[in-house]
């Protein structure tokens, strides 16, 4: 189960927390093997927002993992989730989870103080080494910013820099069956090298689309928030 862009706030009468609780309950009902939150965990990087998030996920019985988005602060994530050992290292919050039939590799490409993402040379080398270490196991790669242009100018302008570098790494590793991300607040699909890319919706709100210059967009629409369930068939493939 992929839950993204939860934008937890401490001052919204628990609306954002309740929306996350609803998504978590549905993921549990569908017996998700694992739950991954793909960034923008909170809205303003505040410690009290991470406290609300920690309380909201405290009783989740399924394995649950967190990764940062451009609204997040790495140090505060570490402080709020000390029992999440995969987060307790210096530098980027990138990690690989080996405990399931599908390997999960999450790459942190956040630039502090900026809304865009960036694949650094060091990040690309880490991803390349991590994927090369287990070449035969089906793998999902997760990041926050979409690694392709969606043609929604609102988000393409604050998208992933050096997406070509990311694509060049993915192209070398055929076991990557899917790339998943968030940031866009709505479902969209694309492709990087051989791998389909799926953008999950947000549990918080949905922005209007900006498809041409000068277009007036709704900052928030009446569309329902959501989350994404990725299902792999027993015969292989998603």
Residue ranges and their predicted role:
Residues 5, 39-40, 69, 144, ...:
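Active-site glycine-centered loops adjacent to acidic/histidine catalytic or metal-binding residues
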Residues 8-12, 75, 113-116, 149-153:
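A short acidic, helix-capping loop that chelates divalent metal ions and anchors anionic groups
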Residues 24-34, 116-198, 227-229, 238:
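His/acidic metal-ligating clusters that form di-metal
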Residues 47-133, 138, 165-175, 193, ...:
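Extended active-site neighborhood of metal-dependent phosphoesterases/phosphodiesterases
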